[in-house]
Design a protein with these regions (language model features):
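Surface-exposed loop/turn segments flanking beta-strands in extracellular/periplasmic regions
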Residues: 1-11, 56-74, 116-144
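Outer-membrane beta-barrel transmembrane strands
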Residues: 9-57, 77-97, 105, 117-119, ...
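Flexible domain-boundary/linker segments
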Residues: 46-48, 61, 109, 125
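Glycine-rich, aromatic-flanked loop segments that form ligand/cofactor-binding clefts
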Residues: 109-116
Length: 175
């Protein structure tokens, strides 16, 4: 809870600012193409997911209730995180019936997945004024950090289904 040194919360309302925002976007597109009607079909699907996350903080000079001198450190912080993810899948499927009792379905496909993230974070202090709430005004850089990470996966797969008169089934799958 509040202590005796906390003072009036309304006093701090404009002294300690913190703004943040997140933008998320998702895009998806795909198609089905009948190369040979009802027998050979190509399917593709692609998806993109993007996130931007930004945070800005700034502490104006302020006087704590029980302190003898004001806090003049004027700390500023900025953080930015960007993420991208994409996925692409494609399959080619062949379906046919031979001599009215032999049913065959063969599928060949592949998939590509990519995810990466970029993070940037920095802090400064001792800005000369409460009117410049950005990192460039701080005379003392206290923290700087940036990092990139990511991974990719490429895979292929195949499946063959055979049945005789819809009674006996043989299925082979590979990935």
């Amino acid at each position: 809870g509040f202590g005796t040194g906390d003072g009036n919360p309304l006093y701090y309302k404009d002294k300690l600012t913190n703004t943040n925002g997140t933008r998320r976007s998702t895009y998806n597109i795909g198609f089905d193409l009948e190369i040979i009607p009802k027998k050979l079909i190509l399917k593709e699907n692609s998806a993109l997911y993007h996130v931007d996350d930004q945070t800005d903080k700034f502490e104006k000079s302020y006087q704590q209730q029980n302190a003898t001198s004001p806090n003049l450190t004027r700390k500023a912080e900025a953080k930015y995180i960007k993420q991208n993810q994409q996925q692409h899948s494609v399959t080619l499927t062949y379906t046919d019936t031979f001599k009215e009792k032999h049913n065959l379905e063969a599928m060949l496909g592949g998939e590509y997945f990519n995810w990466h993230q970029y993070t940037l974070n920095a802090r400064t202090e001792n800005s000369p004024s409460d009117d410049i709430p950005t990192l460039n005004a701080g005379s003392n850089r206290t923290y700087t950090y940036s990092y990139k990470e990511g991974y990719r996966i490429l895979s292929g797969f195949a499946r063959v289904n055979y049945n005789y008169n819809y009674k006996y089934l043989l299925s082979v799958v590979a990935r």
